[in-house]
Amino acid sequence: MPVIAPSILSADFANLERDIHNIEANGADWVHVDVMDGIFVPNISIGIPVVKALRPVTSLPLDVHLIIDRPIRYAEEFIKAGADWLTIHLESDQPQNTLACLDKIRAMGCKAAISLKPKTPAEAAIPYLAKCDMVLVMTVEPGFGAQKFMADMMPKVKKIRQMLDEVNPACIIEVDGGVDAVTYRTCRENGAEALVTGSAYFKAADRAAFVKTLRA
């Protein structure tokens, strides 16, 4: 059964606590938190104080996606703020720093993940797979919500699943971007076990039914 992780990037920021309680009530599994710095991607979203404020609001795991430059500088603070999963982009720093960051995340008892932008090939993840609890494949360009799903990312998902089965079978794959009541199926068929859904979840007339659909 897949993990369903609504992204608060599409929530009402003036009523964030309400929307997170809604995520819980509708049966989702994680809260996905996109952190953007305006450098690695052109958008700016939220930071450590917001993650810290969210932690006492929900018992659901906080799936924090650092879409930032040189995340090793901030990983420890996000974990202390309450992140349960911490995802860093392999494109965001030099390989040795990315490996060190993954080690730091896991040493602090947090689940570690890497993410790949659409133009990054699956093979770029090879040096990091043994140190990951999850690989996040972006199915849109990171930085903004409500983008169109890139179906041509599915061979990448399948390839990464094959590579993981050889070196780290327990590691799961998450997809993020344009996941809705139609596109979720191809994600699951190609090996995704966690689905980030933003605008499709928050715009759904019946959010609980939408979550059930993604699990069907």
Regions found by a protein language model. Give the residues of each.
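Short gly/ser/thr-rich secondary-structure transition/capping motifs
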Residues: 115-119
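Helix C-cap/helix->beta junction micro-motif
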Residues: 58, 108, 167-169
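Thr-Gly-centered strand-to-loop micro-motif
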Residues: 88, 175, 197-198
